[in-house]
């Protein structure tokens, strides 16, 4: 058990330190886990399936070196989870080019500014690391666009409608200009650091402003330009399943997301059952019959969005104070 726990601890340290952002968000004091300071990085954007397979196989072979029967209950659970995840990791390597870093909801273009704006500063070193990360934005975006161009060559690029949405998100970020929250949130966090002198705070705020204008904004501008050039490359507008082997990849994603070996159809059936059970429970709590619940739902769907919002606004007055004008 001790040897297995040492292995999992090493694996944890290796995985969590793969990129600076994950490390900082996970551990306040990495040195307590024996993790030494390294150069700031957003992590390697792995595009080679064989490299992913090799990494997964190496980790799994190390795992199989432990005698399962010798482990205690807790470690057996950890073993099973790791074994399951590593098998999926190896399978997913064949679908590396199906991944989409520029997702419409949680893509890099929308999440990176949020992640940076919430990056906590505990000391001066954190500020230095943060600024080093900001200066790597262009390089990071270049790696993503190399990946997207390769997807386009393979016929796996997003449709034009999605491209327009991503471009719109990039432009909206750029249009914030001097009012961009990466300026204000950085200044707020730096000003709260009592270990810095006033001059250091002022210097860091200026450094951040220069880094945003010299690295972040150009990265978004370049991405916008290159996405414009890739328009027309995406032929599939019907969804993931309509790509070659898209159905198999979707099934793999379902396994990764749920941790279940059930088929997609079985999961859909379970979801429908759960929805029906929840609706029945809600009807009982509200004292509604099934007919009354359906009639209430029909009334809502017949209304326009403005009417629904106005109704919610009126209904909230009894529970919330009036908003400022």
Tell me what each language-model feature is:
Residues 1-325:
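N-terminal maturation segment of proteins
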């Amino acid at each position: 058990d001790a040897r297995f726990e040492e292995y999992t601890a090493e694996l944890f340290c290796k995985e969590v330190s793969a990129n600076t952002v994950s490390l900082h968000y996970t551990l306040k004091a990495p040195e307590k886990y024996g993790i030494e300071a390294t150069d700031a990085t957003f992590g390697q954007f792995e595009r080679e399936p064989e490299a992913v397979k090799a990494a997964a196989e190496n980790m799994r072979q190390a795992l199989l070196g432990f005698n399962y029967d010798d482990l205690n209950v807790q470690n057996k659970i950890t073993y099973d989870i790791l074994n399951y995840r590593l098998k999926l990791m190896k399978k997913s390597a064949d679908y590396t080019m199906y991944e989409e870093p520029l997702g419409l909801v949680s893509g890099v273009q929308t999440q990176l500014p949020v992640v940076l704006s919430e990056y906590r500063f505990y000391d001066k070193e954190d500020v230095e690391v943060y600024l080093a990360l900001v200066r790597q934005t262009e390089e990071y975006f270049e790696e993503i666009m190399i990946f997207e161009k390769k997807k386009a060559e393979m016929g796996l690029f997003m449709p034009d409608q999605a491209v327009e949405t991503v471009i719109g998100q990039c432009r909206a970020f750029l249009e914030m200009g001097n009012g961009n929250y990466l300026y204000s949130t950085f200044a707020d966090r730096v000003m709260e650091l009592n270990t810095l002198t006033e001059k250091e705070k002022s210097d860091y705020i200026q450094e951040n402003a220069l880094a945003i204008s010299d690295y972040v904004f150009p990265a978004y501008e370049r991405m916008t330009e290159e996405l414009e050039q890739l328009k027309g490359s995406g032929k599939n507008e019907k969804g993931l399943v309509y790509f070659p082997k898209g159905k198999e990849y979707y099934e793999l994603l379902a396994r990764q997301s749920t941790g279940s070996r059930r088929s997609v159809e079985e999961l859909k059936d379970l979801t429908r059952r759960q929805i029906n059970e929840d609706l029945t429970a809600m009807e009982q709590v509200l004292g509604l019959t099934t007919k009354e619940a359906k009639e209430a739902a029909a009334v809502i769907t017949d209304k326009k969005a403005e009417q629904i919002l106005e109704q919610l606004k009126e209904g909230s007055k009894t529970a919330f104070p009036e908003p400022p004008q």
